[in-house]
């Protein structure tokens, strides 16, 4: 075993039997980017001077939050038994929002390193990604990471892992990504256990896109895995889903900085540059083939990313609207799953209705808009797409509560998800109670070990998008983990709750909720706004209503001047006259007065926790 290959196989000339394509799959925070760093150092593709932590996570947000958002592919040389091999490592995102990206990255590999934190054990995303890997028939190498931690329990979790995969506990490799212990044996096992790629070198070229990123200077850089045939620079290629034709300006491998090559052969992983400026032209999961000798059959598994969570984003300063539009156009270049359309709100002005893959995606997009483009934004409460069937059989898709049709509705269907919750067994009751409150149905339950349990629920997506995850964490002292997967839709008894200020509807506060929860939502919103709206010269009623029926009401008391201050003693009729006069004035003011909702009230009322906490603080101070 040589720690580093002396003469690494050159791209385009590598025999498939010398290639090993693998990815690292793990739950968030189980240390896959750190392990990738050690591999880069050991194989010598990054020298010690240029090394920095989480080398492959390029975005500031990725580095700060410690999460991987975009997949990366790196070619590393490794010598084993006197033979030099080329290992292609694909670093995958670990978060549930990016499951489609993970599934495409897995389809580009023959094997997967299943990484589990030796201090925390198996988590929900570990399971989800493991099942994805099994669906793709990958060879799985179980690895326990962070064995240098004092809290590590490698023996206990090795047994859990072995039971899950069906291997011996001794087959689980012990590794520390931080110190580098056990990484060399892991690289040897990758060469030994993971099969070499198989493909027909003489067939028409077929390559699968598993990621694409936008580079300011070079346009879109597309990452591909060649399945059959080979690709060479300067030839014309076709994208099979869009039939768009491009010329290959450059082709090469990442090691981990881009290295141009003479082409890519069967089983190789690399990048293509065609000079295209829009990421939507090279869709993740699409098949690339040669234009002169095209393949007739595309690779399976491609689908368009479908937004699952919608939210309105509005600039706090209305004049920033064109800047927000430009910023979204730029982000879209790098994020093919982002969809948006302009919309206007009576309360918030001009903005955009944006579709996201999930809540993390929403947070990241919003944070990038605020940070990279210096925008101040308000986002409305996240909602999911509903399908409303009217009595005249028309079907309307509603992504914004204010578009919810009034009148004769035959049926409303909402998206549902299959959720997997992993938690210590002492918290079963707390988790079940939470899921039942959120209209969940228990589908099954398994004990992974005597103190860890896996619960499978079918839950409406709308119940998860708001604060389900926070609630789950707080009820289980942070030990539970959640993974979910879209599972069709179901009919539900849903209504739209409107919030009226002085009889006028405020569209930003409208929400679609289940009929049983409508009263609770109405009372909460009215109470929250009562604390947030400043007192006016006249009384302001805050009402929550379903259609024309008011279900909750609060009043913001009027500020009044003490008109009797100048009456020292005197007759009661004099006082009454002054009070009546004031009352008349207030009444007149109420008829013509308009309630201005301050910007802070919008922000606080639309963010679930901040407002509640503020209101609690106020009440506590009283």
From Swiss-Prot:
CDD domains: EF4_II (cd03699), EF4_III (cd16260), LepA (cd01890), lepA_C (cd03709). Signal peptide: none annotated. It catalyses: GTP + H2O = GDP + phosphate + H(+). GO terms for cellular component: plasma membrane. Its main location: membrane. It comes from Kineococcus radiotolerans (strain ATCC BAA-149 / DSM 14245 / SRS30216). GO terms for biological process: positive regulation of translation. Belongs to the TRAFAC class translation factor GTPase superfamily. Classic translation factor GTPase family. LepA subfamily. Keywords: Cell membrane, GTP-binding, Hydrolase, Membrane, Nucleotide-binding, Protein biosynthesis. This is Elongation factor 4. It is a peripheral membrane protein. PANTHER family: TRANSLATION FACTOR GUF1 HOMOLOG, CHLOROPLASTIC (PTHR43512:SF4), TRANSLATION FACTOR GUF1-RELATED (PTHR43512). Transmembrane segments: none annotated. InterPro entries: EF-4 (IPR006297), EFG_III/V (IPR035647), EFG_V-like (IPR000640), EFTu-like_2 (IPR004161), G_TR_CS (IPR031157), LepA_C_sf (IPR038363), LepA_CTD (IPR013842), LepA_IV (IPR035654). Its EC number is 3.6.5.n1. It is found in: Cell membrane. Residues 17-198 form the tr-type G domain. SUPFAM superfamilies: EF-G C-terminal domain-like (SSF54980), P-loop containing nucleoside triphosphate hydrolases (SSF52540), Translation proteins (SSF50447). One of its GO terms (molecular function) is translation elongation factor activity. Required for accurate and efficient protein synthesis under certain stress conditions. May act as a fidelity factor of the translation reaction, by catalyzing a one-codon backward translocation of tRNAs on improperly translocated ribosomes. Back-translocation proceeds from a post-translocation (POST) complex to a pre-translocation (PRE) complex, thus giving elongation factor G a second chance to translocate the tRNAs correctly. Binds to ribosomes in a GTP-dependent manner. GTP binds at residues 29-34, 145-148. It comes from the Bacteria.
């Amino acid at each position: 075993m040589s720690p580093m290959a002396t003469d690494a196989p050159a791209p385009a000339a590598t025999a498939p039997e010398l290639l090993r394509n693998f990815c690292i799959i793990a739950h968030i925070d189980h240390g896959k980017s750190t392990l990738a760093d050690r591999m880069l150092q050991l194989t010598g593709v990054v020298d010690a001077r240029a090394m920095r932590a989480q080398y492959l996570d390029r975005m500031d947000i990725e580095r700060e939050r410690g999460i991987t958002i975009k997949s990366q592919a790196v070619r590393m040389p490794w010598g084993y038994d006197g033979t030099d091999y080329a290992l292609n490592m694909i670093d995958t995102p670990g978060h549930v929002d990016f499951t489609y990206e993970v599934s495409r990255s897995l389809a580009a590999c023959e094997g997967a390193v299943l990484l589990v934190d030796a201090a925390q054990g198996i988590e929900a995303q570990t399971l989800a990604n493991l099942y994805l890997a099994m669906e793709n028939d990958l060879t799985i190498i179980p690895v326990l990471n962070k064995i240098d931690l004092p809290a590590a329990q490698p023996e206990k979790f090795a047994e859990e892992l072995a039971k899950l995969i069906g291997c011996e506990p001794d087959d689980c490799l012990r590794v520390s990504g931080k110190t580098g212990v056990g990484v060399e044996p892991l690289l040897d096992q990758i060469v030994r256990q993971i099969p070499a790629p198989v493909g027909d070198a003489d067939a028409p070229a077929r390559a699968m896109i598993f990621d694409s990123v936008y580079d300011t200077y070079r346009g879109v850089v597309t990452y591909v895995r060649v399945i059959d045939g080979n690709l060479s620079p300067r030839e014309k290629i076709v994208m099979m889903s869009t039939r768009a034709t491009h010329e290959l300006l450059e082709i090469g491998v990442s090691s981990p900085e881009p290295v141009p090559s003479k082409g890519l052969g069967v089983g190789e992983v690399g990048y293509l540059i065609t000079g295209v400026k829009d990421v939507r032209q090279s869709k993740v999961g699409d098949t690339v083939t040669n234009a002169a000798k095209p393949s007739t059959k595309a690779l399976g598994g491609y689908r368009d990313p479908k937004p699952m969570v919608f939210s309105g984003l509005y600039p706090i300063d209305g004049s920033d609207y064109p800047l927000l539009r430009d910023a979204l156009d730029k982000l879209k270049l790098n994020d093919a799953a982002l969809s948006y359309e302009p919309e206007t709100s009576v309360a918030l002005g001009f903005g955009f209705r944006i579709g996201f893959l999930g809540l993390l995606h929403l947070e990241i997009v919003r944070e990038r808009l605020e940070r990279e483009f210096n925008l101040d934004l308000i986002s409305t409460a996240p909602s999911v797409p509903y399908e409303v069937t009217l009595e005249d059989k028309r079907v309307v898709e509603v992504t914004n509560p204010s578009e919810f049709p009034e009148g004769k509705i035959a049926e409303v269907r909402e998206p549902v998800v299959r959720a997997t919750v992993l938690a210590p067994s002492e918290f079963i009751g707390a988790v079940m109670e939470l899921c039942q409150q959120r209209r969940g149905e228990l589908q099954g339950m398994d004990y992974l070990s005597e103190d860890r349990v896996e619960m499978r629920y079918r839950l409406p997506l709308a119940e998860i998008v708001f604060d389900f995850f926070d609630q789950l964490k707080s009820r289980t002292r942070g030990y539970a983990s959640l993974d979910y997967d879209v599972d069709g839709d179901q009919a539900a008894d849903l209504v739209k709750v409107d919030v009226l200020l002085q009889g006028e509807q405020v569209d930003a506060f409208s929400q679609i909720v289940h009929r049983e929860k409508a009263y609770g939502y109405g009372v909460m919103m009215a109470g929250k706004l009562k604390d947030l709206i400043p007192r006016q010269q006249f009384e302001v009623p805050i009402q929550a209503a379903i259609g024309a029926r008011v279900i909750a009401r609060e009043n913001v008391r009027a500020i009044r001047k003490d008109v009797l201050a100048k009456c020292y003693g005197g007759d009661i009729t004099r006082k009454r006259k002054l009070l009546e006069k004031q009352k008349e004035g207030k009444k007149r003011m109420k008829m013509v007065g308009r309630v201005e909702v301050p910007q802070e009230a919008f922000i606080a009322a639309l963010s679930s926790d901040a407002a509640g906490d503020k209101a609690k603080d106020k009440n506590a101070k009283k």
